[in-house]
Amino acid sequence: MAQVQYYGTGRRKHSVARVRLVPGDGNIVINGRSLDEYFGLETLKLIVKQPLVETGTEGQYDVRVNVDGGGFTGQAGAIRHGIARALLQVDPEYRPSLKSAGFLTRDARMKERKKYGLKAARRAPQFSKR
C-alpha cells in the first residue's frame, strides 16, 4: 500500500525548498539533518514551524525537505512557504488562516544589484567638498 504524501515548493530570495509532508509524529528533516542540527538560531526554527502551528497540525506530519541555494534566512523562508503550500493539499480549509498569516505569499524582495560608479547598490563613494 502506498503511503500518502503531500508536496509543496517554496521560494525565498535565491532559495528553493521542495517539501514533502507524510503522516507521522512531527519529525522535520532538512537535507538529511534534523531541524535542530540544520538551523542553529531559534528564530529560524520558529519560522519553519509557523505554518504547522498556525493550522494546529504540529506533531501530525513528518516533514522532509530538500532545500537549495541562498543563506539560512532565505532557506527558512522557503521552507515555510513550501510547508504552507503542502498543507493546502492536505486540507483546503487551511487556506484562510495561512493566507491571513501571509505564508502563501511569495516574498518577492530580492537583493538589489550593484550599480557601476557606486560602491554597492546605493552606497556612493565618499564625497569630499575640497
Curated annotation (Swiss-Prot):
Entry superkingdom: Bacteria
Recorded GO MF terms: RNA binding; structural constituent of ribosome
Pfam families with a match to the protein in the record: Ribosomal_S9
SUPFAM superfamilies membership: Ribosomal protein S5 domain 2-like (SSF54211)
GO cellular component, one term: cytosolic small ribosomal subunit
Gene3D superfamilies: 3.30.230.10
UniProt-listed GO biological process terms: translation
Keywords: Ribonucleoprotein, Ribosomal protein
Entry coiled-coil feature ranges: none
InterPro entries linked to this entry: Ribosomal_Su5_D2-typ_SF (IPR020568), Ribosomal_uS9 (IPR000754), Ribosomal_uS9_bac/plastid (IPR023035), Ribosomal_uS9_CS (IPR020574), Ribsml_uS5_D2-typ_fold_subgr (IPR014721)
PANTHER family linked: RIBOSOMAL PROTEIN S9, SMALL RIBOSOMAL SUBUNIT PROTEIN US9M
Family: Belongs to the universal ribosomal protein uS9 family.
Entries under HAMAP family matching the protein: Ribosomal_uS9_B
Protein name: Small ribosomal subunit protein uS9
Species classification: Bacteria, Bacillati, Bacillota, Bacilli, Bacillales
Gene: rpsI
